[in-house]
Amino acid sequence: MEKTNHSLTTQFILVGFSDHPDLKTPLFLLFSVIYLVTMVGNLGLVAVIYLEPRLHTPMYIFLGNLALMDSCCSCAITPKILENFFSVDRRISLYECMAQFYFLCLAETADCFLLAAMAYDRYVAICNPLQYHSMMSKKLSIQMSIGTFITSNLHSLIHVGCLLRLTFCKSNRIDHFFCDILPLYRLSCTDPFINELMIYIFSMPIQVFTITTVLVSYFCILLTIFKMKSKDGRGKAFSTCASHFFSVSIFYVCLLMYIRPFDEGNKDIPVAVFYTIIIPLLNPFIYSLRNKEVVNAVKKVMKTHSIFKNASASMAR
């Protein structure tokens, strides 16, 4: 199936998890369950935030958008993984590949900005509580979210445009389970210098800006917490930031491990699985299980839905 001539490649083969044919069925079932839980968890969180007026605050606006982007990330990758478990040739066209990368890049870039925005929101809430409503209003959080999507979309389009300038005439086998930028560089017959330059010009500043925002915000938060005389106040502040800090830590550790320089091969696949599939699965539970406001909102929505369901059943009788 692999191309050995120098004709231009318009289709690729996603090698993915084909090295383990004996695990095909268990892996298919595992990824199916992960995909289902991820979509239900994230879209359910978006629905709860939308339906509960008390959650229409900056923190939950950012959280809802984060859940939406995690759903986008999962939709961009997992369906193709599931299809390829039982596909004979595991092919993906060039334009399918570009579309998959576009949505992945959009989701991951937006995640970086949203996590930074959530860190800044927590900084304002803990370090400047009296000025919170003036420094972080609902209107500002909506504007920041819109700006995040516009910037992420432009960032993604820039890299897709640069990828389309490349010609692929080497092997058409992508040693990965999705179309990512670095594995595609390896297959290019065109010098990817401009593409790499775009990474340094656009992607690196985004990473530096968002990581710096998170680090500075949490440094100020920790200083404020340690200055608090009340144990209850410190406990409440730690509890407020713990879930976000845990999520941010996992996301950036995995992302930095993944984008490090690496050799030919598929050594980066386990890390890629974690940050593209596992993190979107975990996020709604990290932010919800220990959050009383979200838990109470879920109970309220379920109770309301149950009331409507019972009323409909009574009317049907």
From Swiss-Prot:
The chain crosses the membrane at residues 29-49, 57-77, 94-114, 145-165, 199-219, 240-259, 269-289. Residues 50-56, 115-144, 220-239, 290-317 are cytoplasmic. It is found in: Cell membrane. Residues 1-28, 78-93, 166-198, 260-268 are extracellular. One of its GO terms (molecular function) is G protein-coupled receptor activity. The keyword Iron-sulfur does not apply. One of its GO terms (cellular component) is plasma membrane. The keyword Transmembrane helix applies. Keywords: Cell membrane, Disulfide bond, G-protein coupled receptor, Glycoprotein, Membrane, Olfaction, Receptor, Sensory transduction, Transducer, Transmembrane, Transmembrane helix. It comes from the Eukaryota. Disulfide bonds join 97-189. It is a multi-pass membrane protein. Glycans are attached at residue 5. Its main location: membrane. Signal peptide: none annotated. Pfam families: 7tm_4. GO terms for biological process: G protein-coupled receptor signaling pathway; sensory perception of smell. Belongs to the G-protein coupled receptor 1 family. Potential odorant receptor. PANTHER family: OLFACTORY RECEPTOR. This is Olfactory receptor 5K16. It comes from Mus musculus. The lineage of its organism: Eukaryota, Metazoa, Chordata, Craniata, Vertebrata. The gene is Or5k16.
